[in-house]
Every structure is written in structure tokens, then in C-alpha cells.
Amino acid sequence: MKKKLMIILLIILIVIGALGAAAYFVLGGKSEKSEAKKSIDEIVASSVDVEEITTNLKSDNIIRLAIKLETDSDKSKEELEKRDFQVKDAVISLLADTNADQIEGDKGKETFKKELKDKINSYLQEGKVEKVYITSFNLQ
């Protein structure tokens, strides 16, 4: 009787341990530190350049900017290249609702980049844009 009880308890402990290990790996056992950062070559390979756009702001100022979009995969890069017209539309639409003082400074640019990333990601079916880089910026 005691031997059967010990075997049952041992089996239960093994099952609990296996479930715990599985949950650890499935639910994100990787910490941010353990995830490898992309090399610069990988970033460049998975990025899309958006040609310079000149448009009016809500405040009647003119802005000229160019951006680079970093994607999470080759598939999302390919899709993004096909959707370049939607990306340009998203940039122009966001800027049309923006005053010059809203986009000046680091905080304004970061807000614009986040809004643009969210809008572009809503179009994508394969992957996502991970980062938006402003590569040229001229506000008049």
C-alpha cells in the first residue's frame, strides 16, 4: 500500500514538473536580456525606406521628411513595399492633423513615430513594423 502511494506521488510530482517546464517555455521563459538583438545588417535587410514626403501641417507650416521602417521579417518587408502608397497616405494624414509645435522636439517626434507605426501595422497582414526612424526632417 505504501509502495503504491509513493509511486503515485512520484508520478504526480513528475507531471507537475513537466507542466511547469512546459508553461515556462510556452509562456515566454525568455527574458528581454536573453533575446538576441538584431545586428545592423539584419536591421538594414529588414527595413524599408520611404522616399521624402513634402506636405502641409495643420498649422500651415510645410514639412519635408523621410523615414525608414524596420520590420520584423522579410515577409512583412515585402508586404510593406507593396503598400508604399498606404504608408505615404498614413504619413500625410497624420501630418495634416498635426501642428508644428506638436512635432517639434524629441517628444513630438516620438509621438508621431508611435502613431505612424500603429497606423501602418493596422494595414499589415504579415508581421509588423517594429520601429520608425526619421531619416530627414525639415520644418518651415
Swiss-Prot record:
List all membrane-crossing ranges: 7-27
Any idea where this protein resides? Cell membrane
Its domain of life? Bacteria
| Membrane topology of the entry | Single-pass membrane protein
Which of UniProt's keywords are assigned here? Cell membrane, Chemotaxis, Flagellar rotation, Membrane, Transmembrane, Transmembrane helix
Query: Which GO BP annotation is one of this protein's?
Result: chemotaxis
Keyword Ribonucleoprotein belongs to the record: no
- Give any Gene Ontology cellular component: plasma membrane
Would the keyword Cell membrane turn up in this protein's UniProt record?
A: yes
Mainly localized where? membrane
NCBIfam families per the UniProt record, alphabetical: PRK07718.1
Family per UniProt? Belongs to the FliL family.
Q: What does this protein do?
A: Controls the rotational direction of flagella during chemotaxis.
What is the protein name stated in its UniProt record? Flagellar protein FliL
The organism named in the record is Bacillus subtilis (strain 168)
What gene name is given for the protein in this entry?
A: fliL
